[in-house]
Amino acid sequence: MSPSIWEKCLKYLQNKLSPIEFSMWIRPLKAEFKKNILILYAPNEFSFNWIKDNYIENLKKLLKNFCNINTTPTLMLKICKPKIIQKKFFNELTLKKNILNSKLTYNVNTKLSNIIYSSEINTNYTFQNFTKGQSNQLAFKTIYKIAHNPGKNYFNPLFLYGKSGLGKTHLLHAVANTILKYKNTIKIIYINSENFIQNMITSLKNNTIEEFKKYYRSVNTLLIDDIQFFAYKKHSQEELFHTINALLNRNQQIIITSDQFPQKIHGIETRLKSRFECGLTIRIDPPDLNTRTKILIKKSHIYDINLSYKVAFFIAKNLKSNIRELEGALNKILANSDSKKKIITINFAYKTLQELFSLPKKSITIKNIQKVVSNYYHITIINLLSQCRLKSIVKPRQIAMAISKKLTNKSLSEIGREFNGRNHATVLYACKKIKKLQEKNNNIKKDFLTLLKILSS
């Protein structure tokens, strides 16, 4: 018997059974061939007994259908031993992703009994590559704490909400990956709400709703993304409500995300909203300028794009919506550059991304100029306005004054007052100084023009 026969069996069963039933009972089986014997290894005793009572006879019939009567192998069922994971099994041959409704990810150190629970988890999303900032600091600290001690705190369920593209899904996957790495005896599921609903519908059609319930209520950590998709789906909400209750009664961790605060989600039952809010609710806001700049720098390293801080700052100043918008900008830069190693300039970024930039101009204030210049030079506004005479502070201060003169209608005296009560002579000196420096120093000229472009865009 060739290994392809077992592959055919798997594909047949995958089309015949519900996604939950297949993922829960069939896919974890490991196959080994010895002479004319097919040995199936169940991951644990519970699975062994269930397969023996419910599937073994059908599996024997299926083998006969795919084999000649004289070549049908003897079928044996055993409980998997730890060393079996090191062997190359035939049913680990790649099944096409478009056939699978649920992607199962695990590593060689993960116990077999947990493999079926780690569905849809993206291993690329970790805490290490998540960019922290003021807008997501509380969410990050809380979820990081939960990941290292799930179900052992008062943050249950944890409800994260915010607009699309702010990192909620990234944090859910980071939790899952951390738990699988450090607590691989814990059973964990990440699932998008639409997939949960679809799995439930399929289970109802195939009369396997009890398996569906056992699957979701037997986990230790449940991560549900985009809960707003349950709106106006009465039966799905009913099942979700009982699933949440079952897990909370066992002190199992639940983390939920949404694009809105629980009470503002239309079409969700009041009792379910109450469950969402009985733990801790945290809002994630759009990233601020510094965080957006850090995100671009970090992503540029991943994309292998030669992006300087000043160019990243320029892009971040003009793209303010969400992280996906920033990633889209980098993709566009990469697509339009001659090579990955090309040095990206402000002008190149502007020409490439001008369609993405927020074009409506806002009135420019001196306070806004002070903020942008301070961020650009990595100094605080307090230092910018202080009496400090360090060159690293004086030059940004003078540039800020010169830009204020150029971009606002304020008098020299009015500008001076905004700079901690300085007089008009100080501002005039700063403007003349920066003008002369631009003629001699290309770096000063470049900084001045870059800041003008940032503030004018």
Swiss-Prot record:
Give an example GO molecular function.
ATP binding
Record flagged with keyword Repeat: no
**Single biological process term from Gene Ontology:** DNA replication initiation
Q: Where is this region: Domain IV, binds dsDNA?
A: 338-457
Where is the segment annotated Domain III, AAA+ region?
120-337
Where are the annotated segments for Domain II?
71-119
Where in or outside the cell it occurs: the entry states:
Cytoplasm
GO CC term, one of those recorded = plasma membrane
Query: Could you tell me which Pfam families the record lists for this protein?
Result: Bac_DnaA, Bac_DnaA_C, DnaA_N
This protein's superkingdom? Bacteria
Q: Which UniProt keywords apply?
A: ATP-binding, Cytoplasm, DNA replication, DNA-binding, Lipid-binding, Nucleotide-binding
What InterPro entries does the annotation carry?
Answer: AAA+_ATPase, Chromosome_initiator_DnaA, Chromosome_initiator_DnaA-like, Chromosome_initiator_DnaA_CS, DnaA_C, DnaA_dom, DnaA_N_dom, DnaA_N_sf
Which PANTHER family does its entry note? CHROMOSOMAL REPLICATION INITIATOR PROTEIN DNAA
What family does the entry list?
Belongs to the DnaA family.
Q: In the UniProt entry, what is the domain comment?
A: Domain I is involved in oligomerization and binding regulators, domain II is flexibile and of varying length in different bacteria, domain III forms the AAA+ region, while domain IV binds dsDNA.
Please describe the quaternary structure of this protein: Oligomerizes as a right-handed, spiral filament on DNA at oriC.
Protein's name in the database: Chromosomal replication initiator protein DnaA
Task: Look up and give the organism this protein is from.
Answer: Buchnera aphidicola subsp. Baizongia pistaciae (strain Bp)
Give the encoding gene's name.
Answer: dnaA
